[in-house]
Structures are given as C-alpha cells and as structure tokens.
Amino acid sequence: MNFALQEDSRFDEVGPAGQVLWCLERLEPEGVREIPSELKFTFSDELCCDLSEEMKALELNLDDELSEIEQQEKSQVKEVIICLTYPHWRAGTLPVSVRVDSFIPYAYESERIRFSFVEAKSKEEFPAWVVRKNRYVYGLKDFYDQHELLPGSLLRLRVSKDPGTIIIDPMTHRPKKEWIRTVLVGRDGGIVFATLKQSVTAEFNDRMIVAVPDVAGVDVAREQFAKNKKTLKDNVFAIMKDLSKLNLQGHVHAQELYSAFNIISRCPPAPLFMQLISDPRYTHVGDLHFRIEETG
C-alpha cells in the first residue's frame, strides 16, 4: 500500500520521521500548498553593507525565517520564547527560524509535514503543518484568536516527549489595559501609528507589540502599498517619520522599525537594518536607536 501511494503523485507523505501518514495533496490546507501572501517578500532593492554585531544579534533573536543565518550546530535547548510578528499573526503561522528549527518535526523526504501542538495549560491538542522549504508552520489562526493574542505577543515552545508534537504556551494572563502602539487606517487608505490604551491578554515585547483594530482595513492598505512604485529606501523613511512622532526624542529602535514595516509589507530584518546604516538621513544615537536628521 505504501509503495502504491508513493508512486501516486496525488498523494503526499506528510508524517514526521518514524510515522507513516499520507494525505491527498488537494486536501492539504491552501496555506500549506501555497505561501500565504502575508509571508511573501517582494522588494528587489539590492544593498550590501556589513551589519554591526549588535544588529546581527538582534536579527537572530527576531526569528525571521527569511534571515540568512548559518546554523553552526543543532541546538539542544529544551524551550525557546519567540515574538509573534504581524505577518505570522495574520497568516496563522510561525517562523521556522534558526532558533526554532530544532523544535519542529522533520521527515526524511517530505517538505510538508503534519504534526500536533499541545497547549501547555489546557493540554488541548490541535493539528499544524510545517512547510520546510519555505520555513514556516501553518495552522495557528484559531489558536491566536482563541487567546486574543496581538502581534508582539510572546510564545513559549517546548520540546515534547513525543517527536510528533510540540508544546506551545501562549503566556496569557488576565486582560489588562496597556498603552501600546496601535495601527490605524487613514482616510487616504494608508496606515498611521498612535499610542493608545488597549486590552492585552498575554506577555509581550515592548518594541514589537501593536494593536490592530481594523484588520480588514490594514489588508486593503497592504494591497494599496504593494502597488506603489517607491523604493525600499523611500518606504522605510515614511515609516521612520511616522514612528518618530511617538516619543519626544524622536528616536526609533531598529526592532520597532522591523515590527512596524512588516505590518504594511513583508521584509526580513537585514534589508531594513542596512537602510538605517547606509542612509545619511539617519543618525545612530546608541543601543540601536536612530533618529532622522533635520534638513534645511
């Protein structure tokens, strides 16, 4: 039977290593067969410059699956805490980054693998898929909605005794009001940022957290943004100007830029950090904080 299914192109072997599991390809979720639009990086600007060691360390900790980071050796850690970015929050996915890779089930041949998450507190189990070629895990949208997570929320992943499952902890707490960045859709269809009081239900990263009251509006804004002909340089400057209005010093941290830019368009950290280094309009004021230089 297994040989017959292996020879039939309509079927995929989707079990983790050591488990035999077959699935009709057309019955696999669309987000498994095709990369969700929110995860696609489309900018073609080429810019080459060396990142500082500080920036490289931040890039590693951002767990972006598009980052080209060499894995020196297989990690033996038993748990990792990652920060949920807007693209993955919207698509219901998780990145398979260098730090996350050792937690994710693998197969000897298949690039699409079905496995299970187990919620740490409730012990509730739910299915997910890893698409190793494109380095993401699909199937968490309902989980994010159930726990009312926001982009910037922290997730703890733990190794399970069962190689086909991963323990996931949303690190939730009683809802409380916090002043956090909030993305709003303007009359022109573009996005703007404001600091507003919002309900928060889980632990979060201060520089990554963002509330999105109008998700459908942001979807339209992303579509509109994708049609503009501006360069990455111009688009980064527009986001930096908007973010700089949120504090009296006008400083923007590189991590804040990464979080905000990925709301409107998918981009890994390195191209954004390179813009901060190469564009003379920005001055590094320390600890990866940048400000826009006044001209004229």
Q: Which residues does each predicted region cover?
A:
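Acidic, low-complexity intrinsically disordered regions
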Residues: 1-296
